[in-house]
């Protein structure tokens, strides 16, 4: 029974990776933000870093979440954009 549950969980996880968008665009009044999802999957390697509740939409996602989580991760890794104009493009 444990093997069946583990197999189903793995299937759902892999399906999420297979059907995830390559790039997402988030509308913002000071310029849209293009998010290279596939690139982040490859670099971070752990979906739960952002998708804490599992595959799909991120609970609580919005400006405050993105600034805290995305910018915070970039600062922590010393890699990626951290200034407004680096992400927001008009």
UniProtKB/Swiss-Prot annotation:
Gene3D superfamilies: Cytochrome C3 (3.90.10.10)
Signal peptide: 1-20
Entry keywords, A to Z: Electron transport, Heme, Iron, Metal-binding, Signal, Sulfate respiration, Transport
GO molecular function: electron transfer activity; heme binding; metal ion binding
Residues annotated as binding heme 2: 40, 70, 73-74
Name of the protein described by the UniProt record: Cytochrome c7
Similarity-based family: Belongs to the cytochrome c family.
Origin superkingdom: Bacteria
PTM note: Binds 3 heme groups per subunit.
Pfam families xrefs: Cytochrom_CIII (PF02085)
UniProt: heme 3 binding residues: 67, 84, 87-88
InterPro entries linked: Cyt_c_III (IPR002322), Cyt_c_III_dom (IPR020942), Cytochrome_c (IPR053591), Multihaem_cyt_sf (IPR036280)
UniProt-listed NCBIfam families: CytC7_Geobact
Record-level GO BP terms: anaerobic respiration
Record: residues binding heme 1: 37, 47, 50-51
Origin species: Geobacter metallireducens (strain ATCC 53774 / DSM 7210 / GS-15)
Biological role stated in the UniProt entry: May be involved in anaerobic iron respiration.
